Amino acid sequence: MQVGSTVYRHDAKTPRCEPGSRPGTAGITNHESTSKEVPFNVRTPANYDPTIAHPLLVVYAAAGNNRYETEGLTGLTTEATGRGFIVAYPDHLRLSLPVLEELATIPALVARKWCIDETRIYLTGQSDGGMATDAIAFLAKTRGTAAAIAPSAAGVNAKDLAEYSCPEPLPVMVMHSRNDTVFPGYGAEAARWWAACNRCDSTPGPKDAHGCVAYPNCANGVQTLYCEGTGKHKDWPPMNAAVLDFFEAHGAAQK
């Protein structure tokens, strides 16, 4: 999949990196890995400027999918890099607490080699990747990694979530199909849990053009969205522009 070119804003408010401080190259980089050898790929804008701090999007994989399959499934690379994001795609590993903690190290590893604005780290993923997205956001050892999350088709329901304490208010965009037969109804349950954690009103507003409802009056002005699609469990929702819009509207991770 091709990377896009972005338009940089050069102003005094733009976070920067010292010239020569980040060795990562522009475009397509494959075969990066964590300390425990979780492979991941990195995509930057074609005209990547290593002195400008970029938002980072980490896209976690569904069960059985590798990083290349995740990139193909989501189709995020071209649009995200064209909008100035750096994107990382890790392989899937069977989820466990140690694996989730390892997956949560990827943003810091990317930031060692590429110029990343560490207040603008965003997580998304499909199925197990959505579960990883949720878990990294609420687990005690990994919360604070992300400025906003957008899990899709995640296998996390109200019973699971009841075992965990809430993180600080966090922008969340839950995507789930009403036709998901693997995790039926899980997305709506997860959205209600996040809305309660974010101290929103309990009744969401009307659906927008993407099928999303927003829980109003959340703490700290964060957004809490539930977006209900009609595809199968394995289908990535056709709303990449809306996901990227959501991420662009939110920065500054909450510890």
Give, region by region, the residue ranges found by the protein language model:
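Active-site nucleophile loop of the alpha/beta-hydrolase fold
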Residues: H92, I149-N157, S177-N179
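A domain-start/cap signature at the N-terminus of enzymes
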Residues: M1-H54, Q126-A150, V156, P204-N217, ...
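Short beta-strand element of the alpha/beta-hydrolase
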Residues: T51-A63
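Alpha/beta-hydrolase active-site loop
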Residues: L95-E118, A135
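Structural cue for short, hydrophobic secondary-structure segments
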Residues: V59-A62, Y89, V174
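Alpha/beta-hydrolase fold nucleophile elbow
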Residues: C115-S127
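C-terminal catalytic histidine-bearing segment of alpha/beta-hydrolase fold enzymes
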Residues: M173-M175, V182-A188, C197-K255
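Short amphipathic alpha-helix adjacent to the substrate-entry channel of hydrolases
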Residues: E69-A88
